[in-house]
Amino acid sequence: QVTNNKINEPQTIDTQLLKFDSDTLHARPMSWPDYTLASLPYKGIDYGEFEVLNNSKRILSQPGTVTIEFFFDDLKRGNYRFEVRTQVGDEEIYKARDFSVKSPHYPSLRTPRELAAPLVYLMRKDDHEELMAISDLKHQKLAVDRFWLSNIKNTTKALQVIELYYERVEEANKQFSNYKEGWKTDMGMMYILFGPPWYIENTLEQKIWRYSNDFYNPETNFTFKSYKFKNKFYPFDNFQLLRNQQYFSLEYRQIQKWLSGSILRDNI
């Protein structure tokens, strides 16, 4: 909504839609090094790299208040900013809104590719890349089913594990979505593998997820640090796990629980 208070002076409204380069990768393993400060996964969005998708100019020749609506069809997945500029006397007025576009049925998983992608937390790298390279959707869905049933031999148990896994993926999308899908975030990965924490300890810059009453056990307490950027339009939380090489065996054991089906009785 824009107001022109000048009777004999038209007001110009300039707008543009930007698309930014942003991180789309899934969370890296718990035992790997932390992200480097200059990396895109650390920053989330690179505001220095963008594409101008649309720009327009509107001139209000008459005084009064008008509402201007903008429609952008078929925006692809990614992160955008809509900017509006106008001049009021000697002052430039600038407003902006950052937003993210995901799949039409997000946070649900509907397509074989969407079902296959989160299996990256359970599969070997080469195997998952081979799965994601399958172009035929029917064959890809069969490969997803084959992965589960080849590990969990009991069909009934396999169906229960599959249901639990994708319930957590969808819940991760609901709770931890930011500039990318929630399941791809560090918190999303931890939620999928370990489930909801027993307790959450919040401070201004970090969250601690606790999965036991022993607050000193590194295998049941995980710290996420929030990385803030000097950009008032950055609308996303960006909590990243403080990784540790000691998590290697813990992560391995947790993956084996999923692959064996014992996750149903022993979460952590």
PLM segments and residue spans:
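Long, intrinsically disordered, low-complexity segments
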Residues: 237-249
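Surface-exposed, short loops/turns at beta-strand junctions within beta-sandwich domains
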Residues: 72-78
